[in-house]
Every structure is written in C-alpha cells, then in structure tokens.
Amino acid sequence: MGVQQQSELPSQTSAKYFSLREDVSTESLSDIDSQTDINNTGNSGKDYSSPPRLSLWGWYTPSQYRGNSSGVTMKNLSASEDSISLSSLDHQQQPMLMVDHSSNSDNEDGATAKDFKIDIHLKGEDEDDGSGDTRVKYNTRNSGTLRNSSNKTQTTVLNNSTTSSNNINNNNDKEINITTLGGSTNSTTKFLYSSVDQSNGSTIRYPYSPSYSDATFSILSGVVILFSIIYSLLVGPIQIMFAFLVSILVFISYICASFAANNRIYLYSITALAVGLGLTIPSFFAATGAVVLGTGRDKSTWDVELFKSDQVLMGWMWPKGQMAIFVDESTIIGPDSFIGKLSTEILQLSYISYYIWGYFMEIYILYNLWRCHLSKDPQQQKMMPIWDQRLKMFICSWISTYFIVFSINLIFPAVSPRVYIGKTLNLYNNTLEGFGFAGFVRSRIDNAAKGSFGSFPSGHIATSFAIGLSSYKILPAYGFVSTIAAILIAIATMYLRYHYFVDFLAALPVTIFCLLYGGFYTPSDFKNVFVNCFYSIKSIFQNILSKFNNK
C-alpha cells in the first residue's frame, strides 16, 4: 500500500486536490499474454501483449507507452497521432493518466496498491515565469511530474529499473521530454516518430524515422551487390572471389530477412546480413586494389599531387608539409629517442584499434537485439524494433564510409607517403620500430597493404569518426572512448607515414555525409556545432582584445 505524500499549498493559489487509489488484482498481472483490448469501439479479443513483429520493410512496431488498468486497455493512438496526447491539452481539459501494470508487483502476492496525489493548478502571479501553464503531479511508487505549457511539456518518471531521457516533438512544435531515473543503466532516447504494428495494431514511438532507416539500409545492401557486379565485370569474379562471396551472403540474407515468416528467422537473417556487411571491409578493400591493378589505374597514381598539396597547406609548419618528416628529423621526438619510441608504440596501437571499434559496437547491438527476443519480459521484447533500428542505422553510418572511400580510390589511386615518400623519394632516414611491437605490426601491415591504392581519402579517419559519433547516440561512454581513439588514429595516420594531410581533410566531409546518411545526425546538428565554435572563437578573441585595450 503506497503512502500518500503530504503537500503544502502555496498562498494565493487556486488548487484542486483529489486522491485516486487503485487496486490491481493478481489475476490481472499473472498472465500478461492473456490481456485483451477493450477499446472505445467495443471491440475485444485483440492481443496487444504479443511481441512486436520485425521486418525490413514492414515497419512493425510493439505496443509500448500503452495504459492498462484492471484488464482494460486504453485505446491505442494511430500513426498520425502524437505519442502523448497531453501535449495538446488546454487548461480546461482534464489530464489523463495512463498507468501500465505489466511491470513486476511490489507485493509478494502479486497485488499492487498505488496511491496517487494529483495537484492541478494554474500558476499565479506569485510564480516568476508567468507562462500560465497547467501543472500535473502525481506521487506513487512509480512517481512522476508532468508539466504542460504552451511551448514545452516535461514528464519525469522515477522507477527501479533503468534511466532514459526521451524527447518527442509533435506537429504543434511542442516538445515532450520524458526522463526515467533509477537503476544501474543509463540511456538516452528521443522518440519522434509513430508507427503501427500491423501484427497487432499497437503503436511504438521510434527515436528516428523507421521508413528512412529501412530505406538507407536497403540501399546500402544494394550498393554492396552493385559493387560486386561492377568489379566482376571489370576484372572477373575470380580476382575478387572473397568480395564476390560476401556479396552473395549479403544478397541471400537480405532476401531472407525481407520475407521472414517470424522474428526468429528474421533475427537469424539480419545477423547473417550484419556479419556479411562487416566482412565487406577487408574483402572489398582487397578487391578495390585488384580492380586498380586490373584496369591499369596503378600507372597513374596521384601521390605527386597529394604531396604537393601538403607542401602548400602545411609547408609553413612542417618540412615539405609532412609531420612524418618533421618527426624523422627531430632529435627530441625522433624515432630513435625514448619519446619517439613510446609515441610510435602508442600511435601504432591506436592505429590498429581502428579495426575493432566498429565490430565491437555491432556485436553489442546484436547482443541486445537477441536478448530482447529471448527475454520473457514483455517490456524487453517491445524494445526489439528499437535495437533493430539502431543496428541498421549504425551499419549505414559505418559501412557506407568504406564504399564512398572505395569509389574515390578508383578515381584517385595513391600508394601513401610510406611508399611514395619513403621508397620512391627516399626522404625518410629512420625506420619506425618503437620498442619492437610497433615494428612487428608495421611489417605485417606492409605485407597486407601490397597492391593497395587507398591513400586518398583516409578510410581510417573517415570510418573512425563515423563509428565514434554514431556510437555516442547508442552508448555514450563507448562513443566517447572511440571518438578519442579516432583522434589518436587521425594523428597516427600522418605520424606513422600512412596518409597525407589532404587525406585527412578529404575524410572529414565523407564522415559528415555518412553520419547524415545513417540518420543519427541532421544538418542542423552540424550547423549548430560550427556556429557554436565560431562564437566560442569570437568570444576568446574579444576577451584577448579587451585585455589589451584595458592595458
């Protein structure tokens, strides 16, 4: 039995108070799968507790954010309706509380008794902001605060499970922030899009457009198959056998996922598809080099132009515009000094970590997707479409960078400073061995990179930043760490003689485009970053000038 919380009324405030006690029997909680819909039309017998149906093109959605009390299910919102109807309430309308009792009971016998205290009042002149909003409060074991104003509605919910923050914008330019506090895990989700689960008629709020994420994922799968066909026509499938087999895996698994009869088949198919798309990295990297050699593009590489561009852009800072030459000639941080050896080891380790960040995040998303499917908790099952969408969007942000880079490599093949400056021009006097480990890794990379012409733009830089920034939208801590690793990788590519500075510059727009393509970011996000940077730099210069003027 919940305990009512005492509340003191502020003076000169018109307020109405009432208490609502709600007892839920054990029978209504014992079998969630037996709950049926009794909506406003009088229809019954439709099961809304079944797991959501997953599909590449069906956009099936689970029945979450749905109120149920004593076996009676509230009418579900249509796809055109906003996720929470309270945002459109005016002061004369009574707010509606939607309570979900599908969670575990606090009592040992399974029964739950909850006490609500609801405070409805208009702000008076004694409150400073004068927005004249309607405030609704209720206290219970799962307590919360909901605020409805003309511009913004904010809801805070306290529970014992997870922590999440959700922002929902409706068609009336009102924003709904839903923050859930408690438990050991933290996540941030913005639910902006509604869609109807065609398998049971229920509604889910997606953080991103399901139509967009499904379309971009399908386009990426088609691009992989198209590259395989074009490469096969240019040099034959035998020369690119690994990439050809991977493209077949992508094609078959995509077809199976599109026509999957149930979630289990879909998950097996989408897992195979995710693995296949992950394998496009090494397979099409080698295939692109084979196509450059097979078409004779290796006879006209662009290393001379890239080297001259570095001299123009960075010649004022480094000799011949190369960080690697500056390090090679330095007596303090040179390859033979202790600092130089330590730097070489750290940066070489950072460089090879590029190969794991994307795969680890892909495995993490697949793990959560399968965990939701295998869970017996209906609330966990209802998160399957969210993790499915995250998988598609992350793969689009991650893998699309490679195919843009591969396309540019075919047009502007280059062998990298390690080969052109080091072996053709002989401008490096020392080798980068570090304490031994770096030299071992470099020898393996040199052997694996024979026949490679992928210097411009830097795929390492483009992909690393795409992984870090997209991962931040899924798992912020992982995204932060992988973004730091991306910065180290960017430095390592030039320090370790793998890329020119212009390779770094060309990789940045590729990263931005792929993040936009994946859907985690919008053009306004990048615009805000540039605007904030501009004003920050402007403020710094203004402060410096003001100090000089004061003197």
UniProtKB/Swiss-Prot annotation:
GO molecular function: inositol phosphoceramide synthase activity
Keyword Phosphoprotein: no
Protein name: PA-phosphatase related-family protein DDB_G0268928
Intracellular or extracellular location(s): Membrane
GO biological process assignments: sphingolipid biosynthetic process
Transmembrane helix in keyword set: yes
Pfam families: PAP2_3 (PF14378)
Keywords in alphabetical order: Membrane, Transmembrane, Transmembrane helix
